[in-house]
Amino acid sequence: MNRQLPARPSLAQLENEVEELRRGAVSPGDAQLMLAREYGFASWSKLKHHVEGMEELENRVERLREEFARGDIETKKRLLKPAHDQRRFENYDPSAGSISDRDARLLIANEEGYALWNKYESFLHLDPDVRDVIAAVQIGDLERLKEVLQANPSAANPSWVPGFAAPRPAPNDSIPLFCVSQAVFDGLNQRGNGYEITQALIDAGADVDTEGGHPLTAAVSFGALRVAEALIDNGAKVDGVDGDGVPMAYAMHFTFREIAELLARRGAKLDVRFAAGLGRLDIVKSFFADKGSLKPGSGALADPFGLERKQKGQSVFWCERTPANILSQALYYACIHNELQVAEFLLSQGADINAIVPGLDIQATILHRVAALGVIEPRTRVLNFLLEHGASLTVRDLAFHGSPVGWAYYCNRRDIFDLLIDQAGIHDLVRFDRIDRLRAVLEENPQLARSCDARGLTPLHYLHGHLKHAQEIVDVLIAHGADVNARDSAGQSVLETVNRMGTPEMVEHLRSLGATLETTGRS
């Protein structure tokens, strides 16, 4: 049995152990090799390289903590800048006197491109040959990849240094076949050799269906068409390892049409939702009974992110397979893939164009999703189709309470924003400073000045500090009957909201019109 390295190994300690072995009349080279093999490494150079890397990591953690502790607030803000998600930190605070060991490690992981510390820790403890494989994969260096694999074919699959308790399931970026697709998507490998890189790994023994089918899931999620082809050519299961359609769900949701077509050509199963996304109207119609009801199995295949859900022990279905839910998803896939003939048919069968589409990660309507995807000619056609068939610009998503116009704006889809803004609801006209359009809308329907959104917010609640026409907006709303002391569903007044989101000038103007700042809540 191999000896285990300590959690924080020291090269100096290893060199002392080499000296101990040399006392038995062993040559320096033999002593180093003996020690390396005791710890499960093929050579002294690999053991030394691993330990030096771990020592440098510990030094880096210590340097970061010391610099943070003695730095001013601007230094601390700079040090915290690489953070991916502040919510993952114990204490993300540039005014804090120190940063914890845990937060320092997470910050370093984020700086290296890893969302979580355990993912970066896993990478650091990979077998050195596996790390060399991943390094070659990431830049598309086929010659170097073949060289490493020829010396150690087992490096085509993830393995870790002895004594390291690898997380389960294996982090995706510790899997060489996953890294092929990620490198294509991130633009690290621009050599166009994704197929050849994948084939070299498979020829060396890489498992095409490892970790529940992660390699093909990665290829379809990252839009790596040639990688997907290589995997399928070598036996990757086109419907996923459990035959539940997980790969197609990713391709559909992420709008990788070429990959969806590839999966279908290679025999992937289609339910009514996937057939709708592929424009297979004949197949779509085959799922309806004579009286228009959906047949059993119409929504039999997975929702997006099925692999992640299975890894957590959950079902691949995010939502109940009711007729309304199945129709909503089918309409969603048809629209984001520009299959408007299919969409027309689904609407005739009762699909709700303004439903919050179930079973997805976005908790929004189809119009929200299309507005965020960006404007190319097919998107414009879909937008016009949706609006002509009654899609609402005032429905708000459940996570961020944004409208489709807001989604276009925050996703920087300015062409779509410009197309939609003049048709937007009154709340968005206030939010986006459209004073001229606001006047016209209120002249036509003054009652809108007092209208409320789903959270009870009036147009006045949408005032904020970046408006150039704030006073004019307030005045025109008041002139058409807006209540300067209106409260939202949580009991918050207009003035409370503007006091938080607006400017002192806006607050004073509202006060001059009779607004009062009272305690939140209703009696």
Kindly label every feature range from the protein language model.
Residues 127-135, 158-186, 209-220, 241-252, ...:
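Ankyrin-repeat boundary/"N-cap" motif
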Residues 58, 66, 124-197, 280-282, ...:
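Extended repeat-based scaffolds of very large eukaryotic assembly and lipid-transport proteins
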Residues 155, 162, 183, 187, ...:
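Alpha-solenoid repeat scaffolds
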Residues 144, 193-197, 226-227, 258-259, ...:
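Conserved ankyrin/ankyrin-like repeat signature
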Residues 149-155, 196-207, 229-237, 262-268, ...:
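Ankyrin repeat domain, specifically the short helix-to-loop turn at the C-terminus of the second helix
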Residues 1-146, 151:
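Intrinsically disordered, low-complexity eukaryotic regions enriched in glycine, serine
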Residues 47-48, 113-124, 252-266, 405-421:
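Short, structured interface segments
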Residues 140, 193, 223, 255, ...:
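Ankyrin-repeat intra-repeat helix-capping/turn positions
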